[in-house]
Amino acid sequence: MTDKKVTRLRRARKARLKMHELEVVRLCVFRSSQHIYAQVISADGNKVLASASTLDKELRDGATGNIDAATKVGQLVATRAKAAGVSQVAFDRSGFKYHGRVKALADAAREAGLEF
């Protein structure tokens, strides 16, 4: 693995450990160069309660690797999480900088009703 990826994973591990200690439901984000994925994971970490990505049928036709796509994913994961009975989550950025697509997804999820 590259040094950049190793440091990102180290940051992610530290944040996830803290969330595990607090036993909170988390909104986990992963971004690749072409897509962005979001999952709402239970407090024990064993179950995915809701998920959305740019690979979903509703979002696949449009652009998938930009801020507009991340905003749509954030709105979709928030509505699915609320349908599953989740209203409060901890934001797990997976070691990525809180900037650009990650920030757009988080802001859209907040506007759609999720509390961080």
UniProtKB/Swiss-Prot annotation:
Domain of life: Bacteria
Keyword Ribosomal protein annotated: yes
SUPFAM superfamilies per UniProt: Translational machinery components (SSF53137)
Alphabetized UniProt keyword annotations: Ribonucleoprotein, Ribosomal protein, RNA-binding, rRNA-binding
Gene Ontology molecular function: 5S rRNA binding; structural constituent of ribosome
Any one Gene Ontology BP term: translation
Signal peptide extent: none
GO CC entries: cytosolic large ribosomal subunit
NCBIfam families xrefs: L18_bact
Quaternary structure annotation from Swiss-Prot or TrEMBL: Part of the 50S ribosomal subunit; part of the 5S rRNA/L5/L18/L25 subcomplex. Contacts the 5S and 23S rRNAs.
HAMAP family in the cross-refs: Ribosomal_uL18_B
Protein name (database record): Large ribosomal subunit protein uL18
Organism: Pseudomonas fluorescens (strain Pf0-1)
Source organism phylogeny: Bacteria, Pseudomonadati, Pseudomonadota, Gammaproteobacteria, Pseudomonadales
Gene name per UniProt: rplR
